[in-house]
């Protein structure tokens, strides 16, 4: 019986020696591995082997595995990864390539970290145990390195509220245990922030304002091992209450618009139509509604709640129209008064305006002319008054007795000196005299003649000569 077992064992060894090495030494590994630059990858691998001779190895012999890059000189120990403590990997791959599997358990899995573009190439596995040394050249692994396209992830609340602080987290879910942690940086258009970095993530605290709505915020991650960077950009949605509520008015078919303020008053002519557009700045958009006095109005178009079209039939009574903007964070309203006026009223108002303007202009012109005349008169010097004798100026004597004629002889009293002749070069002027008669005495009924003669006083008022 013992002899039979020995014969079977010898026959089995001879059978193994005669087999194809590919049937004795097998390896299962991915033939092509694609990985992005700066990242890491785990390549699963397992192998099998058999004894060719009884003296190849013993159960106590350790099992060593080696990963080589094709084209390297194995005689110079150019190993990329091994579990043999005596032999070390080359400097370029040290602390980046690891034989993660246990060859004792037929595990040859390879772990690669911080992959660089120059790592691309062909790799094969080598087994050493006792006298058995075998290179699995039939089962090579091709490593392809591409550009880094992975981006970080940003976690944030669905909506940010203006004036309230919020936390945002930037992380790299493809973290695979780098020798140095990644470097995080934040950039934003106008937002102010404070960040706190941890291994594999960064927490950002921001207090957004309404002007930050719609702006970009970027988280950038730099991998120190390869110095490659990747970034993620988001658009901020900041919730804020309504502001800058305005009403734009279009009169009739006119394309010219007018922006009205709260409390504005607008006269409306007879037969006129209006289009009122209410708008505000808020996020999410505020609910807009119109009311007339205390009556809520239906919007002209459901798709445009801020649009209100008013036709002459609506405007004949006028009134106060109010636009209300309602929002979860606050509300605003704006009111305007529409005053209908007939065409006659408008014409009278315009005529009154024109007449008033004309009268004002005429009064102003009259005052200006008068001031100019007075100013011109004051500038000319006054000439001395000269009286020229009138050709009909005679010595006159008036008798108190009407029955007695006046005598015009040389014995009469001379005229006052004011009647003296003026120089011939002076222009002749007209003088006026005032005749004053004394109270007449009663007539002598007895025919006696009064020997006393009464004369009248002739007064010439002195006139200033015209220049």
From Swiss-Prot:
Translocase in keyword set: no
Residue intervals passing through the bilayer: 354-374
Key word Repeat present: yes
A GO CC term assigned to this protein in UniProt: membrane
Entry membrane topology: Single-pass type I membrane protein
Pfam families: Ig_3 (PF13927), V-set (PF07686)
Subunit structure: Homodimer; disulfide-linked. Interacts with PTPN6/SHP-1 and PTPN11/SHP-2 upon phosphorylation.
Name of the molecule in the record: Sialic acid-binding Ig-like lectin 12
Protein source organism: Mus musculus
């Amino acid at each position: 019986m013992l002899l039979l077992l020995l014969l079977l064992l010898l026959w089995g060894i001879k059978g193994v020696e005669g087999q194809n090495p590919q049937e004795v030494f097998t390896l299962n590994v991915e033939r092509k591995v694609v990985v992005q630059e700066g990242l890491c990858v785990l390549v699963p691998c397992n192998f099998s082997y058999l004894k060719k001779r009884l003296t190849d190895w013993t159960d106590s012999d350790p099992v060593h595995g080696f990963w080589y890059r094709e084209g390297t000189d194995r005689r110079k120990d150019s190993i990329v990864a091994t579990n043999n403590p005596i032999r070390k990997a080359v400097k370029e791959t040290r602390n980046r390539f690891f034989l993660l599997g246990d060859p004792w358990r037929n595990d040859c899995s390879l772990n690669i970290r911080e992959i660089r573009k120059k790592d691309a190439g062909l790799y094969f596995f080598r087994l050493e145990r006792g006298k058995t040394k075998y290179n699995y050249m039939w089962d090579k692994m091709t490593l392809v390195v591409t550009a880094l396209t992975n981006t970080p992830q940003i976690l944030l609340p669905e909506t940010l509220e203006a004036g309230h602080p919020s936390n945002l987290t930037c992380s790299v879910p493809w973290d695979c245990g780098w020798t140095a942690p990644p470097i995080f940086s934040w950039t934003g258009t106008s937002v102010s922030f404070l960040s706190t970095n941890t291994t594999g993530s960064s927490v950002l605290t921001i207090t957004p304002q309404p002007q930050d709505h719609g702006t970009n915020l970027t988280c950038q991650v730099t991998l120190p091992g390869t110095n490659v960077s990747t970034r993620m950009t988001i658009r901020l949605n900041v919730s804020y209450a309504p502001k800058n509520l305005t009403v734009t008015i279009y009169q009739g078919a006119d394309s010219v618009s007018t922006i009205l303020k709260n409390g504005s008053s607008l006269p409306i002519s007879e037969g006129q139509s209006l289009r009122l557009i209410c708008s505000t700045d808020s996020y999410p958009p505020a609910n807009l509604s119109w009311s007339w006095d205390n009556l809520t109005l239906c919007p002209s178009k459901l798709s445009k709640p801020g649009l209100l079209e008013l036709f002459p039939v609506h405007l004949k009574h006028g009134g106060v129209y109010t636009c209300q903007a309602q929002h979860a964070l606050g509300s605003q309203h704006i009111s305007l008064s529409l005053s209908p006026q007939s065409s006659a009223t408008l014409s009278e108002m315009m005529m009154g305006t024109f007449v008033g303007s004309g009268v004002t202009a005429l009064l102003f012109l009259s005052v200006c002319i008068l001031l100019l005349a007075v100013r011109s008169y004051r500038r000319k010097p006054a000439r001395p008054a000269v009286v020229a004798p009138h050709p009909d100026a005679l010595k006159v004597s008036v008798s108190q007795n009407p029955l007695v004629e006046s005598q015009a002889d040389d014995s009469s009293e001379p005229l006052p000196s004011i009647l003296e002749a003026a120089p011939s070069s002076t222009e002749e002027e007209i003088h006026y005299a005032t005749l004053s008669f004394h109270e007449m005495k009663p007539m002598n009924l007895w025919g006696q003649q009064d020997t006393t003669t009464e004369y009248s006083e002739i007064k010439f008022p002195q006139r200033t000569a015209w220049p």
